[in-house]
Amino acid sequence: MAAVGARWGRRVGYRRRRPLPALVVLVALVVLSGLLWTRVFGSVEDIDAATTCNPPGAPTAPPEVSGQPAQVPLGTMLERDALNSTTPVPPQDVHVRVLNGNGESRQATMVGDELASLGFSKGGADNDSVYVNYDLQCHGQIRFGAAGMSAARTLSLIAPCAQLVRDEREDAAVDFALGADFDDIKTTQEAKQVLQQLQNWVPQRDHQEGAQQEVTPPQISEDLLTKARDVHC
């Protein structure tokens, strides 16, 4: 019995766990997290760089020689998210003039036709009176005044790589200047959904205006608006 008591009374030594595997996992998680955040910030910086345009150069020849319109001031270049808090309007309320800022023949006309097929109001095509040397080195610019912020917001949903530029115009018309990097209208499925929802809202707006009621703005998901502009530029 004494032997049995001695066996059960023996203190079992504490087995110390080696911390190395847990430490390796922790380090790996920290490194992975750092890589993910680097990619996030890198992608933001990349798209900011891709959507930033050069300032216009001075005219190389006077208008009477070049055949170009007299150069006008550019306006203020804005951040890509400058209109994120602005409510878009239906595309048929957006009067868009497409400008040739890159020297590509007939491109502005074809883009204007494509915008019309998406429901935008045609404002014609013309040569750019800001980048008169056709030296717009980016995807393009959306130019607007204070009255055209909502219209510019709508256009930016299907031209998410274009830089936003605010100028001193007084009407709600918007200019879409095409740059050297422009390849096509980038209409995501989410952007098409937003345009359709805006068009579906028009009868409600017209009814409220006809009844002299306060117009309820369109209810568009913020997540949908964000995804509409989530493209590679």
Walk through the language-model features, giving the residues of each.
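Residue-level signal for protein termini and structural transition zones
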Residues: M1-C233
